[in-house]
Amino acid sequence: NARQLGKERIMELDERWIKLKGRLPEADQIMNSKVSALLTAAMNKQSYFKEAILTGNQGETVAMNMVTTDYWQGDEEKFTAIFDTNLPSRKPDSHISRARWDDSTKAMIAQVSVPVYDGDYMIGTLTVGVDLKRVPHPNH
């Protein structure tokens, strides 16, 4: 969030991102960040973790373990269900999506989203995609 982009710039970048399927310098810059490296390392610890997306306070992607299908997450339920600029927040402290096919991960996933705070201020969200076919069953 240190580098705030205007809404117009976010939308322009999102449009280019979708059109070029994430093959652009901005996606490379995000993927090569230290935070993206940490997300990638965490996701590699379990085979059922498929994706991790860290957003800023406008829903823009600021870190990821793999290139996402779009840059702006701000219009998606994983962001809108939990992000709140009001203090105290009146939204849930987590969100679990319905299972769905995900083109980025090529798997049937559920997304678990939580808010990210800096002190008392909600500064973004973290979403983790979980491959439901790989989650260990407690009876096996």
Language-model features and meaning:
Residues 58-61, 68-71, 102-105, 130-132:
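Solvent-exposed loop/turn segments at secondary-structure junctions
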Residues 1-34, 60:
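Extracellular/periplasmic ligand-binding regions of membrane signal-transduction receptors
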